Amino acid sequence: MGKNTIRRYRFGNPTDTDAVVLKLPAETGEIPRLKAEPVIDPETGSEKGIRFSFGMDPEDILFGLGETVRGQNKRGHRYTAWNTDEVCHTEDKQSLYASHNLLLIFGPGKLFGIFLDDPGRVTWDLGYTRQDQAVIVSENGDLDLYILEGESLTEIAREFRRLTGRSYLPPRWAFGYIQSRWGYASE
């Protein structure tokens, strides 16, 4: 598989979410491509989470985060991974029904993925506050962070599937009659 790698880094005391099927030992030391630092509560002086950041070049494109609104390139916006049931899905909404904490970074000399196995609130500031910087904040700081590297976006996606397992696709007939409780206008 060439240069494909998955590295795991553990912070705090994470909850086992069963999101990962490939059990890897946690590495220690510096995280490649990311800077990690604690988030300090200004009132108490105690740690209240962890912040990861990396610099971005103008050409960098950011993909991922699953069920979030806006276009394919997530750059220039802020997203919150915290499941909410929003009736009106407009572009100013930061989170939806599901949290998918996978971000793919593609740019000149840059190609990697970040996956946070964190059931808590995670904020992704992807060049919203500063155009040249991405900042990811885990509110509780208890998580497993995975760095995925490969020679192409397809290879990184393949590594992610190896990490989290293959999705089950039921046969078409298994869906039966599907009905929504919402009303939809004829379009």
Regions found by a protein language model. Give the residues of each.
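Catalytic and substrate-binding clefts that recognize carbohydrates or anionic sugar/phosphate headgroups
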Residues: 1-172, 180-182
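Conserved, well-structured core segments
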Residues: 177
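Short, acidic/polar
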Residues: 185-187
